[in-house]
Design a protein with these regions (language model features):
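N-terminal targeting signals for export/organelle localization
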Residues: 1-56
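Short, small/polar residue-rich loop motifs at catalytic or cofactor-binding pockets
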Residues: 54-56, 78, 176-178
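A short beta-strand-turn-helix
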Residues: 59-79, 103-106
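Short active-site neighborhood of thiol/selenol oxidoreductases, capturing the structured segment around
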Residues: 72-99
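Hydrophobic beta-strand anchors of alpha/beta hydrolase catalytic cores
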Residues: 80-81, 115, 181
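Structural microenvironment flanking redox-active thiols in thiol-disulfide oxidoreductases
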Residues: 94-154
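Thiol/disulfide oxidoreductase modules built on the thioredoxin-like
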Residues: 150-206
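Short, hydrophobic alpha-helical segments
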Residues: 207-211
Length: 211
């Protein structure tokens, strides 16, 4: 991966209009006056889209194996997108462990679910590191990377915020990022945003519903 330019270590406010609002609301668990016009709960336990639309493509992103991420190839499956990074000390490992438990609750149906863990830290998260990291959680969790620009574009399409902090004296830097999960159904439509602390049983139920 090419090294990020200095300005790329500054603040990145990337918004996807309603998606950004959904992620914030899901993460905070709050209600907004007039929200029923935008959202619907239906049978899902996260914050659902009332009029599902095709999920934005993840152009330029590849799996840790180097294969392009093609959401069209995942039709018939529930797809979860989670943006994070392997050096994350708390939210990412906790969230991936929760996703893994929800997947395991599906039994034989676990093959109908794929989680894309999209790194927002491509300089440190090499494909090899991503593959090792995700393998600790589940074989249904796939590490995804790409150029800094491709990742920023994907984040913008899904309303994901992230910010790379300045490195400390030892070269370490933290990354702030949206901690919610985005759910795509078996028809390739955006359906729901879950907070990272969603109940594992509720998440498993939703994954069955989305296939």
């Amino acid at each position: 991966m090419r090294e990020l330019e200095p300005e790329r270590r500054g603040r990145r406010w990337v918004r996807g209009a309603a998606l950004f609002a959904l992620a914030i609301l899901a993460g905070l668990g709050v209600a907004w006056f007039g929200l029923p016009r935008l959202l619907a709960r239906d049978a899902l336990h996260g914050t659902a889209f009332p009029d599902p639309e095709p999920a934005p493509a993840l152009d330029g992103l590849v799996t840790a194996d180097g294969a392009p991420v093609d959401l069209a190839a995942d039709r018939g499956k529930a797809v979860v997108l989670f943006f994070g990074y392997t050096s994350c000390p708390d939210v990412c490992p906790t969230s991936l462990a929760l996703l893994s438990r929800a997947i395991d609750e599906l039994g034989d149906d676990r093959e109908d679910v794929v989680v894309y863990f999209v790194s927002v830290d491509p300089d440190r998260d090499t494909p090899e590191l991503l593959a090792r990291y995700t393998s600790h959680f589940s074989d249904r969790i796939v590490g995804v990377t790409g150029s800094a620009d491709a990742i920023a574009d994907a984040a913008a399409r899904y309303g994901i915020f992230y910010e790379l902090h300045e490195p400390d004296a030892d070269g370490y830097y933290a990354v702030d990022h949206t901690a919610s999960f985005t759910g795509i159904d078996g028809k390739g439509r955006l359906r729901v945003v879950w907070p990272s602390e969603v109940d594992v049983d509720d998440l498993a139920s939703d994954l069955r519903h989305l296939r």
